[in-house]
């Protein structure tokens, strides 16, 4: 009896790119909703503006490159890039910040290198870092949670502030950032970094209202939302578990060592986990299959390296949150890491080329 044997691979994956992109977008909803609940409409407006800009840029570049627009424009990758960038921006950043960042992410970082699957860097993080370096003032005007803001940031006020720089009543962004107590607010990471640099202890720093009663007012729930979405992606096997778990483990170990050595000047492990962009970076950006490592060992190494870099930048660098910089550095290292962690090909001896 003759048997017909199909050529390898025998294990097929029927997941299509648009389906995967939609799944990741859906998984961000808990974090985005928490962001809206605690910080208002700002990021939702930026997300909508970024998505519109991304579609226009993608359509224009695909037309110039004479690529199949109907297929590549609607694969969801541009929308996901815009979503991640919109999440990361300050809620009251001016509208042109979103447009410039999205154009850079789509046109330069993604399409200039050949489109989806060819970009060496994560487009959203590259766009964010470009904005942070080029426009540091606009990119560091973080809005405190709504409970600490003296101005009513409804949808109209927020939209007007993003478009003009002033609320309907005439308040500037700097005035909006002023708390009910008359103190200009910053993020918990920024506040802690500034205060410890001035010689204050962590215990003295967390008396600031921005820290709330737990870890970081509002930010802990935003991170919890992205953690929930990330676990959903792992359960659906949409992302590999090695990278986010090793990243969180590395950040936990580094912060635990720092806190054990100097609790007066080092934040706790849970603070590092549930503040800034920790969970967003762990589950939604580091797991990018295009710019990350491909082998299981490589993914673990990338996660460990990213966690170490985030901790070092947060504690010793010039920026309060180092997730974006750490991810781009890991993107640069991923090809080299893959080179030395590539599994042996079946049928070949170790060391064979």
UniProtKB/Swiss-Prot annotation:
Membrane topology: Multi-pass membrane protein
Enzyme Commission numbers on file: 7.-.-.-
Localization, UniProt: Cell inner membrane
Spans traversing the lipid bilayer: 20-39, 68-88, 129-149, 215-235, 238-258, 267-287, 300-320
Gene Ontology biological process terms from the UniProt entry: electron transport chain; transmembrane transport
UniProt cross-references to Pfam families, sorted A to Z: NQR2_RnfD_RnfE
Taxonomy, superkingdom: Bacteria
UniProt xrefs under NCBIfam families: PRK00816.1 (NF002011), rnfD (TIGR01946)
Subunit and partners: The complex is composed of six subunits: RnfA, RnfB, RnfC, RnfD, RnfE and RnfG.
Annotated protein name in UniProt: Ion-translocating oxidoreductase complex subunit D
Species classification: Bacteria, Pseudomonadati, Pseudomonadota, Gammaproteobacteria, Alteromonadales
